[in-house]
């Protein structure tokens, strides 16, 4: 069985653990059943969730059994934020989001194939509404609440911060009871003895450990453990997982596969070594080789390309990744634009300077106007100079006539035009 702790330490993933020697021994004696919770606070997971989802997968590949727990019940409340009360979403919305998260999480782990005998390391995908939905108010207060100290709960950093500001509802104040009880139920039902989560979850996770000790006195499945992962920050000080257009989602309807690929491909050279260790399943030797290439030949972006391809394939599938790569090549003159998947081309053009216009192709203005309206050049006179100097392209064909207009035959898939200034500046026109 692979020493998963050594691997996680090398990758810089471990923030805190309970007694490391005890945890290492339990893992060596394994397989250990572990879990991570994912609350449906939105209709999709985003790239920030990948750290936990992929860490679960690393444990599975090391010979352990992961449980991905979707918070169908805890999502009705939401883990308290440091600055403000969460908006409560309707039960119908939560149910829809739970379904979305289950579908997304299923792509990271290996489950028992239908009709097959389960293996000890086959993953489980559970919903805490299964037990929390049956919990009564009296049961919560009598059987769970009596094990919690108000003094300790008030000392929690999030609670203190909120009480110093706008305050906190009892609903959010009691969230820790529910998350802690999740650990108890998974311990009882599945012999789960390890919970993982982000470093901000340390207090909630250790509260679950205490509750197991209090409710399961003799600990029939052995002692429970906790492990949190490090907070991921970017070298430029901005928040990981955010772009100018917002969060980078795993749902292709919210973030296109093309935009997802470009997010990783555009990673800062200072960040890519850490990203490789946290998000890639490549071996230590492969990662160190890519890190060296970044140092020696940064312009090649070999590490960024490798990670973008690996994660796009993992999240969106091999075919979508191929579509994205072909689109990236074709946009910059190294492929045939007409052969691209229309959805991929449309998504790609929305990630570059573009303009969306209504009407027919006959109603479109001259090309110099289109170049200016996309922002590829600052003005129509600049567009004319670019054409005269041989630096303007329509669908990768050089434009030589400053009076040129677009024809029906120029439209890709009946609605797209790809404009380019020089080798690297790409823009687009999308007909509605």
UniProtKB/Swiss-Prot annotation:
Quaternary structure and partners: Homodimer.
Residue sites binding L-tyrosine per the record: 35, 175, 179
Domain S4 RNA-binding span(s) in chain numbering: 365-422
Family designation: Belongs to the class-I aminoacyl-tRNA synthetase family. TyrS type 1 subfamily.
Gene that specifies this protein: tyrS
Compartment annotation: Cytoplasm
Highest taxon of the lineage: Bacteria
Protein name: Tyrosine--tRNA ligase
GO annotations of cellular component type: cytosol
Lineage: Bacteria, Bacillati, Actinomycetota, Actinomycetes, Streptosporangiales
């Amino acid at each position: 069985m692979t020493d998963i702790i050594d691997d996680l330490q090398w990758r810089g993933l471990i923030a805190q653990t309970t007694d490391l020697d005890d945890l290492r021994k339990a893992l060596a004696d394994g397989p250990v059943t572990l879990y991570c919770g994912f609350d449906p606070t939105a209709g999709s997971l985003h790239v920030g969730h990948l750290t936990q989802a992929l860490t679960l997968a690393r444990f599975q590949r090391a010979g352990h059994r992961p449980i991905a727990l979707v918070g169908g019940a805890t999502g009705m409340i939401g883990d308290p934020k440091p600055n403000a009360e969460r908006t409560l979403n309707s039960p119908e919305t939560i149910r829809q989001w739970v379904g979305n998260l289950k579908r997304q999480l299923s792509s990271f782990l290996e489950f028992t194939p239908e009709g097959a005998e389960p293996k000890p390391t086959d993953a489980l995908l559970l919903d805490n509404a299964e037990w929390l939905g049956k919990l009564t108010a009296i049961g919560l207060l009598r059987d769970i609440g009596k094990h919690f100290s108000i003094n300790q709960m008030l000392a929690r950093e999030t609670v203190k911060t909120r009480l110093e500001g706008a305050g906190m509802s009892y609903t959010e104040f009691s969230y820790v009871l529910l998350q802690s009880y999740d650990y108890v139920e998974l311990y009882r039902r599945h012999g789960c003895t390890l919970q993982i989560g982000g470093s901000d979850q340390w207090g909630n996770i250790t509260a679950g450990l205490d509750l197991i000790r209090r409710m399961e006195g003799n600990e029939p499945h052995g002692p429970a453990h906790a492990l949190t992962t490090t907070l991921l920050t970017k070298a430029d000080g901005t928040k990981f997982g955010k772009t100018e257009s917002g969060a980078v989602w795993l749902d292709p309807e919210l973030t296109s596969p093309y935009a997802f690929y470009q997010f990783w491909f555009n990673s800062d050279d200072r960040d890519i070594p850490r990203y490789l260790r946290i998000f890639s399943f490549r071996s230590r030797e492969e990662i160190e080789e890519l890190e060296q290439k970044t140092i020696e030949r940064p312009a090649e972006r070999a590490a960024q390309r490798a990670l973008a391809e690996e994660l796009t394939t993992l999240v969106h599938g091999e075919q979508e990744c191929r579509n994205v790569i072909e689109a990236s090549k074709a946009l910059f003159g190294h492929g045939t634009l007409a052969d691209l998947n229309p959805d991929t081309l449309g998504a790609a053009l929305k990630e570059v300077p573009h303009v969306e216009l209504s009407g027919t192709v006959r109603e479109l203005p001259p090309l110099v106007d289109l170049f200016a309206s996309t922002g590829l050049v600052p003005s129509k006179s600049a567009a004319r100079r670019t054409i005269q100097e041989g630096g303007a392209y329509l669908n990768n064909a050089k434009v030589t006539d400053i009076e040129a207009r677009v024809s029906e035959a120029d439209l890709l898939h009946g609605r797209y035009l790809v404009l380019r200034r020089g080798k690297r500046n790409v823009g687009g026109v999308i007909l509605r």
